[in-house]
A protein has these predicted regions:
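Short, aromatic-enriched amphipathic alpha-helices that serve as compact interaction elements
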Residues: 1-10, 18
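Hydrophobic/aromatic beta-strand elements that line small-molecule binding cavities or substrate pockets
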Residues: 3, 38, 54-60, 72-74, ...
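A solvent-exposed, acidic/Ser-Thr-rich amphipathic alpha-helical stretch
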Residues: 12-62, 83-85
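Short, cysteine-centered beta-strand-loop-beta hairpins and adjacent loop/turn segments enriched
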Residues: 75-84
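Short beta-strand edge/turn micro-motifs at domain boundaries
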Residues: 86-113
Length: 116
């Protein structure tokens, strides 16, 4: 939930703390972003997050690794248009000396037509 709040606030410092420097993030558009691309695209780009809600959250923890799956509803503004879409999300988190950090994420294709 801290990641969702950081996205909506465009809080670059918080995202840098939450995301692992070796991050590999696959977007629903099938683009694979590294750490710098992910942070910049979510805090300085044309994409503005308004809200993100997670439903049916499931977490499995084994030692210093956690896998989260959820249905996610994203509310964003892109190119001046308000959009809302729902995707299946998988994240892998690892416990580090700095706390839990997201090492990888994958957002599936949006379900249903975008609203907005």
């Amino acid at each position: 939930m801290r990641r969702a709040a950081a996205l909506a606030a465009r809080d670059e410092a918080a995202l840098r703390t939450l995301m692992h420097p070796a991050l590999q993030w696959t977007t629903f558009r099938n683009d694979v972003l590294g750490y710098e691309e992910y942070v910049a695209g979510n805090t300085r780009g044309e994409l503005m997050w308004r809200a993100q809600r997670l439903d049916d959250v499931r977490v499995t923890v084994v030692a210093d690794t956690a896998v989260l799956t959820a249905w996610v509803t994203d509310e964003v503004t892109r190119d001046g248009r308000d959009l809302e879409f729902r995707v299946r999300l998988t994240q892998t988190w690892v416990r580090t000396e700095q706390g839990w950090r997201c090492l990888s994420g994958h957002a599936g294709a949006p379900v249903g037509p975008p609203a907005g």
